[in-house]
Amino acid sequence: MSHAVKIYDTCIGCTQCVRACPLDVLEMVPWDGCKAGQIASSPRTEDCVGCKRCETACPTDFLSIRVYLGDETSRSMGLSY
């Protein structure tokens, strides 16, 4: 089952989520929207196993990264009833 990884604009560019991911799903890319000048990106979501270690590692109170497991992804997109 595939999962979706969403990075929100509350990301502070700290790299904690990237370092926490055991499968190298995440990477940092340039972004001018924060002081660090970079934001997390999830180019390899097909490799995500849904462990949510990235969520746990995120230091922001806004939880700047969310992993939506397969069922959650379908519901949030209105694909299941």
From Swiss-Prot:
Cofactor binding note:
Binds 2 [4Fe-4S] clusters. Cluster 2 is most probably the spectroscopically characterized electron acceptor FA and cluster 1 is most probably FB.
Task: Give the top-level enzyme category.
Answer: oxidoreductase
Annotated GO MF terms: 4 iron, 4 sulfur cluster binding; electron transfer activity; metal ion binding; oxidoreductase activity
| Residues where [4Fe-4S] cluster 2 binds | C21, C48, C51, C54
Which residue ranges does the record assign to the 4Fe-4S ferredoxin-type domain? 2-31, 37-68
Q: Which UniProt keywords apply?
A: 4Fe-4S, Electron transport, Iron, Iron-sulfur, Membrane, Metal-binding, Oxidoreductase, Photosynthesis, Photosystem I, Repeat, Thylakoid, Transport
Q: Which domain of life is it from?
A: Bacteria
| Reported cofactor(s) | [4Fe-4S] cluster
According to its UniProt record, the EC number is 1.97.1.12
Provide GO CC annotations from the record. photosystem I; plasma membrane-derived thylakoid membrane
Q: Which GO terms describe its biological process?
A: photosynthetic electron transport in photosystem I
Localization (cell) = Cellular thylakoid membrane
How does this chain sit within the bilayer? Peripheral membrane protein
Residue positions annotated to bind [4Fe-4S] cluster 1 are C11, C14, C17, C58
Catalysis performed (reactions): reduced [plastocyanin] + hnu + oxidized [2Fe-2S]-[ferredoxin] = oxidized [plastocyanin] + reduced [2Fe-2S]-[ferredoxin]
Please describe what this protein does: Apoprotein for the two 4Fe-4S centers FA and FB of photosystem I (PSI); essential for photochemical activity. FB is the terminal electron acceptor of PSI, donating electrons to ferredoxin. The C-terminus interacts with PsaA/B/D and helps assemble the protein into the PSI complex. Required for binding of PsaD and PsaE to PSI. PSI is a plastocyanin/cytochrome c6-ferredoxin oxidoreductase, converting photonic excitation into a charge separation, which transfers an electron from the donor P700 chlorophyll pair to the spectroscopically characterized acceptors A0, A1, FX, FA and FB in turn.
Subunit-level organization: The cyanobacterial PSI reaction center is composed of one copy each of PsaA,B,C,D,E,F,I,J,K,L,M and X, and forms trimeric complexes.
Classification via HAMAP family: PSI_PsaC (MF_01303)
Question: Can you name this protein?
Answer: Photosystem I iron-sulfur center
Q: Which organism is it from?
A: Synechococcus sp. (strain CC9311)
